[in-house]
Amino acid sequence: MLQTTPPDLLLGAPDLREAAAAWLAVLKTERRFSENTVEAYGRDLRQFLAHLARSGAAPDIPALVALKPRDLRAFMAARRAEGVSGRSLMRALAALRSFARHLDREGHGTVSALSAVRSPKVERRLPRPLPVAAAVAMASPDIRAGEDRPDWVLARDAAVLALLYGAGLRIGEALGIRRKDAPVGDIDTLTILGKGQKTRMVPVIAPVQAAVADYLAVCPHPLPPDGPLFVGQKGGPLSPRIVQLAVASLRGALGLPDSATPHALRHSFATHLLARQGDLRAIQDLLGHASLATTQVYTKVDSARLLSAFDAAHPRAGRPGG
């Protein structure tokens, strides 16, 4: 269950705390942000208001509207001095801009200072895909057969991971599938509501269908048509954390690095498709990326992989005069 920042933990006047609570509710229910993002945005706002309080400014709505660009730059500088990464600073600024837009929509005024502050530059980290054999193995229940867990739990985890690698889903998208939409039998496509409320159609290949069917055949809990396809041991919605723990177990069994995460399976889906001459636009549609530039990161991954293999295999690679 989502634990957003309680209004009483925010510094500031009551009207500001109420506005913050309403904003977080909108992010969750209307914008459909992930639980982690809503929690992070609430934390970013709390840290900013605490910074204003330390600086002597009253953290209320009029004070926010009257902010100067230097106030925001001082906050960013203070956070950077604390060792906060550029990526986290960029998210904090996005959170403040989101809250400012909420205040504007509610008639509280425009926080114009935010438009004068640039987002910090962040070097885009290349995704780290898994080797094909490792990705396939992670989606197999046989790898964890020795664990003291019910067979249906192992089958469930394998089905979720098969959807991540075999269909390129985000973990939240896989766990959001309803029972009546389970890709089994004649159902070989999924309608996925992804980031930004964008809907996309995703084909489901036979091995993924088989993994889901295997799970359904052994799941001991009743699964109502409009309820979640994947459930926990007590029959409630499956938590992403449980999937992350399953992947951690698989990392140990397969000897994989810490970068082998559930999201790495989605990266692997894209990179392996591209390596097989997949069309970049088609991969963009399958992943649900709003921008082709986001998908083009995988061309860099594939090029880097090929160059690395060349450097390792060719005796004169990288040498002067080669």
Curated annotation (Swiss-Prot):
Annotated ranges, domain Tyr recombinase: 125-311
PANTHER family: PHAGE INTEGRASE-RELATED (PTHR30349), TYROSINE RECOMBINASE XERD (PTHR30349:SF90)
InterPro entries named among the record's database cross-references: CB, DNA_brk_join_enz, Integrase-like_cat_sf, Integrase_catalytic, Integrase_recombinase_N, Integrase_SAM-like_N, Tyrosine_recombinase_XerC/XerD, Tyrosine_recombinase_XerCD
Top-level division of the source organism's lineage: Bacteria
Subunit structure: Forms a cyclic heterotetrameric complex composed of two molecules of XerC and two molecules of XerD.
Active-site residues (renumbered): R170, K195, H263, R266, H289, Y298
GO CC annotation terms, alphabetical: cytoplasm
Signal peptide (residue range): none
Protein name: Tyrosine recombinase XerC
Subcellular location: Cytoplasm
Gene Ontology MF terms in the entry: DNA binding; tyrosine-based site-specific recombinase activity
Disulfide feature: none
Keywords: Cell cycle, Cell division, Chromosome partition, Cytoplasm, DNA integration, DNA recombination, DNA-binding
Organism: Methylobacterium nodulans (strain LMG 21967 / CNCM I-2342 / ORS 2060)
Family from the record: Belongs to the 'phage' integrase family. XerC subfamily.
Domain (Core-binding (CB)) ranges: 14-104
Function: Site-specific tyrosine recombinase, which acts by catalyzing the cutting and rejoining of the recombining DNA molecules. The XerC-XerD complex is essential to convert dimers of the bacterial chromosome into monomers to permit their segregation at cell division. It also contributes to the segregational stability of plasmids.
Gene Ontology BP terms: cell division; chromosome segregation; DNA transposition
One Pfam family per UniProt: Phage_integrase
